[in-house]
Each structure stands twice: as C-alpha cells, then as structure tokens.
Swiss-Prot record:
The gene is rlmH. Pfam families: SPOUT_MTase. This is Ribosomal RNA large subunit methyltransferase H. S-adenosyl-L-methionine binds at L76, G108, F127, S128, K129, M130, T131, F132. It is found in: Cytoplasm. Belongs to the RNA methyltransferase RlmH family. One of its GO terms (cellular component) is cytoplasm. It comes from Clostridium tetani (strain Massachusetts / E88). The keyword Methyltransferase applies.
Length: 159
C-alpha cells in the first residue's frame, strides 16, 4: 500500500524530525510512505475572518495540487469520525481489501483545512476534540498508522 501524508508547514523541531524518521523507518516494512510538506501561510495576530479564510484557501490549493485522482483522501478534521486504534487498523485493512492502494492523509495548518480540501476528501477522521499542534500531529498520525499495521499483522505492540 502507498501512504502519502500531505502536511501544511515544515517540521522545525529536531525531536519531531527524529520521531518522523523513526516511524518512517518502522513503516517501511509495511507500506511505501511519502511525506509532502506544503508551505504554510503566515497568519497575522489579529487576522479577520476573511483573512483566515483566504489563508486556508491558499493552503488548500497547495494541498490539492498534490492530490491525484486515484488517491483515497482522508482529511484530519475536528468534525470527522473518531476511531479506536483497532477500528483505525481495520479501516486501513478494509480499504486495502477494497482495492484502495493509495491512501492520502491530509493535515491542515493552524487554521484547519479549506472547504475545497474537505470536499475532495473521501473520509474525515478526528483523533480527538482537543486541538494539537499540527507539527506534533504528524508524529501522532505516523504512530497510529504504525500501530494499525502491527495490529493488522497480529504483532506485539498494541496494548
């Protein structure tokens, strides 16, 4: 299976880069992983609603340029479906059984995802109603994908 993660913004912190490298290495035995970083737009401190919408649209356009027609797109969104780790593992497995071999996870910037990206998505996933830094979230997503593959294969890891 091919898994692509499209994320707004570059990882800045060394510890996050190391975690992404570690999970990427672990995942290499289960899937082909591709991580795409798109430029995040600077949000002024007192941005108006209109300015925030324009920023989301710009970031959304950059995301959409990286999405191909054959990709099954999973948008990470606060209004998405919440799954347990086991359900998430089953979800990925079921997609593979149905012939979906190109999964793409999309992580928005600090303002979230544009309506165009959400419309293009095939599924909306929510990890929690809490807000997480989008850079840290990339590591959390990779960990859950790795955990999902371990569960799928009946391998020790999931507790």
């Amino acid at each position: 299976m091919n898994i692509t993660i499209i994320s707004v913004g570059k990882l800045k912190e060394k510890y996050l880069k190391l975690a992404v490298e570690e999970y990427s290495k672990r995942l290499s035995r289960y899937c082909k992983l591709n991580i795409i970083e798109v430029t995040d737009e600077k949000t002024p401190d007192n941005a108006s609603e209109k300015e925030e919408l324009q920023i989301k649209e710009k970031e959304g356009d950059l995301i959409l340029k990286n999405i191909k027609d054959n990709m099954f797109v999973i948008a990470l969104d606060l209004n998405g479906n919440e799954l347990t780790s086991i359900d998430f593992s089953n979800f990925i497995n079921d997609l593979g059984i149905k012939g979906e071999s190109n999964l793409t996870f999309v992580i928005g910037g600090s303002l979230g995802l544009s309506s165009k990206v959400l419309s293009r998505s095939n599924y909306k996933l929510c990890f929690s109603k809490m807000t997480f830094p989008h850079q840290l979230f990339r590591v959390m997503l990779l960990e859950q994908i790795y955990r999902g593959y371990r569960i799928m294969n009946g391998e020790p890891y999931h507790k």
